[in-house]
């Protein structure tokens, strides 16, 4: 399975053989080719990501999953050619074709109609687009039909090659129904590997597994005996294996390989050649406004250096041309900064032209033909995170990913280390007006930060503020007398509305340090009193010369004074002429549930100015995303609402577009062209460097990372679409065998016309009518969980039939789904025939784009009612869906009522992780030590909301990340037993700070996690339950919940032994 050079390189995936043909995907389309190799032809022509094409048993049709319309849906087309037909209108982000049934229906997996994205049920789809039949297996990852039915357990959602050597709770497991009676038992339960893609070849069950360290094809008899390996384990992973019942085809590193049989045949590579234009490899211009990265204005704001999709350009603000300063394909240039030397404007930026980051310098007027920008410090800077240039242009300050603060001398190129931190990276680099001092925000133990000062000549470093608070965003005032900054040192708590708690929700405020001991505070009384209004700033000339900054280090911390403004949420403080600017952010909830309407945009961020002379706050603009100040402090370069504007720094811009006080910079003059192949090579290499610099172990946990990159780099020549690249990067990340190594594309595939969903279960009845079987109830405390058919005035009930949508009759075969395409979030008229007969009604509803929140709340209500019924009302029930804001909200919806019962079942199954587990555990670990008995009222426990009796947790393989941690913490703290199965096993965390040049998010497992009782052992293993209770396919099919049943039994048994705490009687 080593890489060889094909006649026409292409990145081939998801093969399926049938007879003399093989179907596969390449270039974001489905193709067919002769199984013995040769020229391929397209089946689809949508140029969107597709997967898992499967040829029908009779060889006449091919079905696949397409994202043409946004969410993945099932499509089918004739093998001989012709238009494709869309079979599903499910709107689920987890839908996938997996094959065909023996009777000619398409076999697909989907979470449609489920309460969780982890529950992908198998369905059989008729080719006429009629209702699918749900197969009685429960959540599965694959179905192999043959002599017996074999199921693959539902995975977390990623392939084995994307997390190689994974051994956690969701590692693929095989179940077989040997007696064909619906009773499944484990197959190969002793195989320590991650199993996927099972299928029958004759009387042998074949599958992929990596139990020998590399994904390979294996097979055995139905009883698990005679296990054989059919492909080597010294190369790339074998992926996407499929069969026509005799031959097997699989993918590996973008190539297709075949085995003629499982009786000793050797794998051989298929020589498949593609034709066509390969449009995704053609160069194209980009829209500069859409791909705007950052900008830096010159001294007087006549022009700016602008970063656009890896290039740096100079743009004049009012008319005039734009010119490229750095736009070489396959090189990423970023963080441009302007400076002035001898009256001439210059630009410096970060480049990866030589691989590791370096600085490049060029005049704003551009380089002479054939000249190149001056490059300094290549390989000495690490990953550059922040950049600042001294006002005199003599040096550049750099904050590196490894905590270093560096100074790079422009003339000599010397790199000097100023300081370094073991607690993260520095930020807010800023020079004094005379270039003699550098200030920055220096990290301490999270979340603390302090300000530091360095003399740029002798590099002596002093503390400007003590390490007590979070001090950030420093800026020297333009007269050099003060250092302004932001700090979260306002302690004015607010009482929680739902529970007894206090929070500091607006703790930041701007502060100022007088640098010389003899400089008075600008906010105090002035010897000569306050001046009247200053003259028009436009008419005020720059002061003579550059002001000198004198700093008396002794007593600096005692000279900190707050600006006379209220505490709020502030960011990005900058100095301007006669004042300072900052962004003030509105206080909003994380979920947006407190908005007047869920669809409303976030409140605006305000750009504010504090006038140091007049001692007042001025509002310069709203909806500010980002800003920079010109060198003379008179103008602001503002990025707002997708536009780059130039406005005054001392007053609100006029409403007159393109006036002197409201200039919109025309970015359409920027000419930046993307050459995809070159850009993808740069992205591949940058991904490798960022992982090298941030992975939780410097030795890459024993993986030869350079060797990995070298091995996969030739595969890059096959890549023809962005989806190919994403898959390749996933596989490269997967070589580390570590959780949280993600690759997430920016998105944008499909038409954007999202499927409308009605929040109800519908089915086709014998009379041909599509009737409502159940209307899901709304959860009034969650705006995302509104039920369209339960809205006031709709009055649609179970049994009613939907006969028309928007005036178009519902097809008795396909139902209302096709008529609801593109209706999500829009008013739609339904024509409804009541179940008891009578006149049809017309109701206006607003369909949903996502039913999961609605179905989730209904599932929780069902589980809670079940626990109450089984325990006679003695046990409470809480489900925690994640360790983020949604999960925190969900806990508190029913905390008071459920915790007040005698015992508590805490269900953390399918917990998606996050970072709030310590808050959850803090709630669960409370113990009652007293009671408050007010007259005429019920007693309350002390502390409040503490469990009265036993707590039992329920976990499954989909409890992951912080969902792993919460279970380990529950065990370590002795809160109660954990029931279920081993959890996901991924606890090396990430911060999601890096995006590639095209917006693709890449993550680096950086934050290793140690847990009492497990040490480092939760990663790639999971947390073992105290009481193991698997949920078998037959349990799902029968609607049984043995894990919850066991938790209830344990809690009731504990109550028998130790009754719940109750309030005492009054003396």
From Swiss-Prot:
pH dependence: Optimum pH is 7.5-7.8.
Catalytic residues as annotated in Swiss-Prot or TrEMBL: 740, 961, 1019
Region entry Disordered, spans: 518-551
Regulation (activators, inhibitors): Stimulated by MgCl2.
GO BP annotations, alphabetical order: proteolysis
EC number: 3.4.21.-
Main localization, broad class: cytoplasm
Annotated region described as PDZ-like, given as residue ranges: 754-851
Site annotation Transition state stabilizer: residues: 962
Molecular function, one GO term: serine-type peptidase activity
Positions that bind substrate: 914
GO cellular component: cytoplasm
Lineage: superkingdom: Bacteria
Subunit structure and binding partners: Forms a homohexameric complex; it is not known if it assembles into higher-order structures.
Purpose: Degrades oligopeptides in a sequential manner.
Protein name as it appears in the record: Tricorn protease homolog 1
Natural source organism: Streptomyces coelicolor (strain ATCC BAA-471 / A3(2) / M145)
Name of the gene: tri1
């Amino acid at each position: 399975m080593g890489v060889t050079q094909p006649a026409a390189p292409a990145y081939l995936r998801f093969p399926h053989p049938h007879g003399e043909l093989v179907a596969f995907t390449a270039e974001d389309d489905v193709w067919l080719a002769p199984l013995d190799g040769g020229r391929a032809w397209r089946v689809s022509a949508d140029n969107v990501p597709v997967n898992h094409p499967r040829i029908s048993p009779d060889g006449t049709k091919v079905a696949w999953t397409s994202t043409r319309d946004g969410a993945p849906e099932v499509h089918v087309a004739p093998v001989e050619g012709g238009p494709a037909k869309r079979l599903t209108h499910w709107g689920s982000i987890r839908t996938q074709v997996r094959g065909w049934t023996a009777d000619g229906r398409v076999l697909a997996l989907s979470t449609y109609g489920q309460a969780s994205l982890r529950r992908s049920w198998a369905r059989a789809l008729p080719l006429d687009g009629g209702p699918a039949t749900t197969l009685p297996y429960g959540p599965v990852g694959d179905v192999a039909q043959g002599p017996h039915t074999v199921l693959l357990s539902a995975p977390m959602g990623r392939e084995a090659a994307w997390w190689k050597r994974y051994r956690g709770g969701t590692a693929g497991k095989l179940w077989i129904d040997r007696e064909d009676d619906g009773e499944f038992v484990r197959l190969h339960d002793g195989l320590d590997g991650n199993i996927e893609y099972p299928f029958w070849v004759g009387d042998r069950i074949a599958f992929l597994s990596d139990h020998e360290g590399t994904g390979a094809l294996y097979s055995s008899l139905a009883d698990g005996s005679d296990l054989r390996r059919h492909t080597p384990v010294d190369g790339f992973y074998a992926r996407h294996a499929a069969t026509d019942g005799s031959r097997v085809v699989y993918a590996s590193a973008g190539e297709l390989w075949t085995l003629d049989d499982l009786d000793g045949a050797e794998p051989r590579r298929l020589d498949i050649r593609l034709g066509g234009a390969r449009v995704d490899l053609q160069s194209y211009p980009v829209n500069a406004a859409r791909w705007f990265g950052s900008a830096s204005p010159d001294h007087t704001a006549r022009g700016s250096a602008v970063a656009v999709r890896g290039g740096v350009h100079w743009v004049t603000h009012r008319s005039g041309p734009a010119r490229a300063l750095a736009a070489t394909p396959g090189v990423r240039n970023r963080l441009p900064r302007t400076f002035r030397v001898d009256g001439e404007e210059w630009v410096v930026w970060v480049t990866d032209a030589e691989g590791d980051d370096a600085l490049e310098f060029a005049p704003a007027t551009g380089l002479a033909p054939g000249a190149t920008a001056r490059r300094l410090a290549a390989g000495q800077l690490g990953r550059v995170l922040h950049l600042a240039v001294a006002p005199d242009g003599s040096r550049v300050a750099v904050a590196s990913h490894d905590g270093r603060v560096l100074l790079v001398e422009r003339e000599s190129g010397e790199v000097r280390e100023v300081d370094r931190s073991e607690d993260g990276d520095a930020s807010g680099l800023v020079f004094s007006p005379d270039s003699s001092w550098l200030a920055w925000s220096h990290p301490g133990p999270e979340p603390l930060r302090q300000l530091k000062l360095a003399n740029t000549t002798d590099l002596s470093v002093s503390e400007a503020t003590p390490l007590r608070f979070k001090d950030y965003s420093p800026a020297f005032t333009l007269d050099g007398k003060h250092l302004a900054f932001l700090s979260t040192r306002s302690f004015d708590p607010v009482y929680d509305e739902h529970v007894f708690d206090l929070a500091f929700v607006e703790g930041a405020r701007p502060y100022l340090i007088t640098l010389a001991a003899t400089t008075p505070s600008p906010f105090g009384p002035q010897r000569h009193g306050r001046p009247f209004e200053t003259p028009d700033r436009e008419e005020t000339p720059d002061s003579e010369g550059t002001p000198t900054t004198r700093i008396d280090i002794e007593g600096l911390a005692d000279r900190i004074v707050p600006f006379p403004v209220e505490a709020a949420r502030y960011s990005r403080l900058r100095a301007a002429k006669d004042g300072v600017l900052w962004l003030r952010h509105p206080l909003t909830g994380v979920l947006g549930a407190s908005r007047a309407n869920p669809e409303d945009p976030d409140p605006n961020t305000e750009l504010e100015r504090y006038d140091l002379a007049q001692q007042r706050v001025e509002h310069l603009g709203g909806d500010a995303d980002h800003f920079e100040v010109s060198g003379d402090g008179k103008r602001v370069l503002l990025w707002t609402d997708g536009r780059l504007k130039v406005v005054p720094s001392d007053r609100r811009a006029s409403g007159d577009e393109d006036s002197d006080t409201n200039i919109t910079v025309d970015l359409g003059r920027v000419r930046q062209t993307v050459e995809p192949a070159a850009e993808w090579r740069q992205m591949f290499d940058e991904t490798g460097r960022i992982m090298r610099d941030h992975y939780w172990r410097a030795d890459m946990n024993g993986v030869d990372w350079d060797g990995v990159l070298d091995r996969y780099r030739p595969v890059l020549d096959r890549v023809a679409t962005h989806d190919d690249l994403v898959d390749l990067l996933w596989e490269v990340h997967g070589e580390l065998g570590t959780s949280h190594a993600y690759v997430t594309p920016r998105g944008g595939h499909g038409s954007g016309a999202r499927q409308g969903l009605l929040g109800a279960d519908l089915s086709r009845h014998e009379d041909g009518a599509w009737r409502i079987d159940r209307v899901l109830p709304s959860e009034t405390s969650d705006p995302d969980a509104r039920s369209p058919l339960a809205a006031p005035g709709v009055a649609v009930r179970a049994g009613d039939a939907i006969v028309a949508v928007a005036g178009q009759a519902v097809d008795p075969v396909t139902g209302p789904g096709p008529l609801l395409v593109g209706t999500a979030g829009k008013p739609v008229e339904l024509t409804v025939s009541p179940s008891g007969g009578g006149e049809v009604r017309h109701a206006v509803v607003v369909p949903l784009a996502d039913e999961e929140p609605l179905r989730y709340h209904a599932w929780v209500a069902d589980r809670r009612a079940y626990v109450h019924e089984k325990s006679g009302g003695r046990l409470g029930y809480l489900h925690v869906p994640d360790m983020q804001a949604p999960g925190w909200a969900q806990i508190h919806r029913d905390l008071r009522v459920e915790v007040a019962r005698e015992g508590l079942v805490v269900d953390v199954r399918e917990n998606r992780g996050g970072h709030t587990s310590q808050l959850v555990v803090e709630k669960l670990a409370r113990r009652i030590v007293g009671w408050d008995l007010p007259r005429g009222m019920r007693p309350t426990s002390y502390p409040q909301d503490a469990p009265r009796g036993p707590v039992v947790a329920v976990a499954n393989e989909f409890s992951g990340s912080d969902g792993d941690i919460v279970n380990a913490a529950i065990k370590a703290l002795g809160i109660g037993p954990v029931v279920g199965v081993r959890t996901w096993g991924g606890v090396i965390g990430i911060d999601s700070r890096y995006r590639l040049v095209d917006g693709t998010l890449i993550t680096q497992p950086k934050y290793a996690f140690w847990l009492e009782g497990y040490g480092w052992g939760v990663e790639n293993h999971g947390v073992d339950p105290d009481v193991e209770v698997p949920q078998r396919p037959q349990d799902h099919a029968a609607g049984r919940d043995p894990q919850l049943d066991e938790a209830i039994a344990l809690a009731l048994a504990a109550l028998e032994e130790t009754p719940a705490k109750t309030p005492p009687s009054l003396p």
